[in-house]
Every structure is written in structure tokens, then in C-alpha cells.
């Protein structure tokens, strides 16, 4: 049986035409709003990397935590579950021993400041931001949309009928809407990789597609959520074996 990682739920319909990208020289069909992991798995490509002569790896957690779905995207190492599929991408399996390539010069970090920095735009992070009345707030999240795993929102390539969606989606959409209507600034697709004290303030270094940013805040809330803790067993890392978060 071929596992499918494509959305098929009441109230969610595809919008826009499909497209294709290349994986190991083959054409892989994809749709707007889905990740490389979803498109590759649905096309039957379960093994995405190798960890030894006879040890292959594939999509496992589906939420960017384990790194098992790492592939080369236009020559760069990326997690397939965290990269949106796009036309004309060239994707290759991650080799066991990758050849390092020179990195492009990193631009200077832009500087941002706020009263409160929230790391994580899931339920807890959004609730904290919504409750911070009167403060300047910045929220960062490595995903392209707020909501986290619990309030995960459909991708940008879908037409939605809110009345037909479940209560969990509507609750999350309402919370996200409240934060969007507030003065809080949401920086999606941004990862925090360092935090240090500077006197009475905290300096957090972040990276994103639009370059690095250094955020200075008086207070910091870490609301990075939870990840699954699978139970090891024989065959648990075989390509096609996934946690519930991915499946």
C-alpha cells in the first residue's frame, strides 16, 4: 500500500493548478500548499536519505523535529517536511557523506526590539501574546503559519469553507485572528538559535529566509510545544514507518 499524505477533509478544497518538481531525475507531481515530504511520500518515494550501506531513512515525525527526511534541495540540505513544494525544484536524496560547499556570505542581522518575545506560535504562544495587552510583542515560529501542531492550519494552496471545518480548526483560527488583529508582530518561518542576557534584557539570534535578525526583549516566553516520544522497536526507522504526527 502506498501511504498518502494529502489533505482530504470536509471544508478543504484544492485551489490552483498542480505542478511538478524533480527527485532523483524523476518528475514528481505536487499541489500548492503541500510540503516536499507530502508530495514525495504520495508519489511512492519513501527512502529520502541513507545512514549506511543498507540503512535508508524517510519521513518519520513529519513536524521538523527528527531530521530523518533531510534531502538536498537545489544543493542545500533541507528537511522535506518543512519545505513547501514548488515548481522546478531539483531534489536529491541526502547522501550518507555530503560534500561541503561554500556558503554564501551571511548578511548583517537586522535589529528588532520589543517588550515581550514569544518563541512558538502554537496555542500557548498565541495565548500569551493575546494576553500581553499594552506591551510590544514579537512572536516567532519556524513554520510558515501560526497554530502549532494542535491548531495546525491548512497550507496556502487551499480554499476553505470555515463552516464545514471542525471546532478545533475554528478555535485555532479565532485565536490566530485575535493575535493578527492586535499590535503583536508575527515572524513566521524564523528559527531562534541563540539566547543570551545583555544586562536587564535578552538578546535572541534568529535566522529565516529573509536573513538573520537579532531581537532584543525585556521578557522572553518559550512556548515551543511538544513532540511525540515514539517507543523504539525493530523496524521503527524503516522508510514508510511514521509517527501519528506524520501519518
Predicted features by range, described:
Residues 39, 148, 230-232:
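Short helix/loop capping segments that flank catalytic or ligand/cofactor-binding pockets
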Residues 114, 121-174, 178:
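Beta1-alpha1 glycine-rich phosphate/pyrophosphate-binding loop at the start
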Residues 12-19, 63-69, 196-202:
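A short, compositionally biased
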Residues 54, 76-114, 171-247:
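FAD-binding core/adjacent interface of flavoenzyme oxidoreductases
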Residues 2-17, 36-38, 42, 47-50:
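Terminal leader/tail segments of proteins
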Residues 2-12, 52, 59, 68-131, ...:
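Fe-S ferredoxin-like electron-transfer domains
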Residues 36-74:
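A basic, amphipathic helix-loop patch mediating RNA/tRNA/ribosome contacts
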Residues 26-34:
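Short, contiguous acidic and Ser/Thr-rich linear segments
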Amino acid at each position: 500500500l502506498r501511504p498518502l499524505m494529502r489533505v482530504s477533509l470536509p471544508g478543504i478544497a484544492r485551489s490552483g493548478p498542480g505542478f511538478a518538481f524533480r527527485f532523483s531525475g524523476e518528475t514528481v507531481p505536487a499541489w500548492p500548499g503541500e510540503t516536499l515530504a507530502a508530495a514525495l511520500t504520495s508519489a511512492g518515494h519513501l527512502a529520502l536519505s541513507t545512514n549506511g550501506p543498507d540503512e535508508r531513512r524517510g519521513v518519520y515525525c513529519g513536524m521538523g523535529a527528527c531530521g530523518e527526511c533531510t534531502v538536498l534541495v537545489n544543493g542545500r540540505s533541507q528537511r522535506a517536511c518543512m519545505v513547501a513544494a514548488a515548481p522546478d525544484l531539483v531534489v536529491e536524496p541526502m547522501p550518507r557523506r555530503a560534500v561541503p560547499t561554500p556558503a554564501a556570505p551571511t548578511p548583517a542581522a537586522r535589529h528588532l526590539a520589543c517588550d515581550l518575545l514569544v518563541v512558538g506560535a502554537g496555542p500557548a504562544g498565541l495565548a500569551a501574546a493575546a494576553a500581553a495587552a499594552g506591551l510590544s510583542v514579537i512572536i516567532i515560529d519556524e513554520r510558515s503559519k501560526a497554530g502549532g501542531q494542535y491548531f495546525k492550519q491548512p497550507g496556502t494552496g487551499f480554499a476553505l469553507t470555515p463552516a464545514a471545518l471542525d471546532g478545533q480548526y475554528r478555535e485555532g483560527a479565532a485565536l490566530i485572528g485575535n493575535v493578527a488583529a492586535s499590535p503583536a508582530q508575527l515572524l513566521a518561518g524564523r528559527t531562534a538559535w541563540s539566547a543570551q542576557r545583555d544586562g536587564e534584557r535578552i538578546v535572541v539570534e534568529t535566522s529565516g529566509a529573509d536573513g538573520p535578525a537579532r531581537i532584543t526583549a525585556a521578557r522572553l516566553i518559550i512556548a515551543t510545544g511538544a513532540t511525540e516520544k515514539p517507543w523504539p522497536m525493530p523496524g521503527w526507522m524503516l522508510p514508510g514507518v511514521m509517527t501519528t504526527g506524520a501519518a
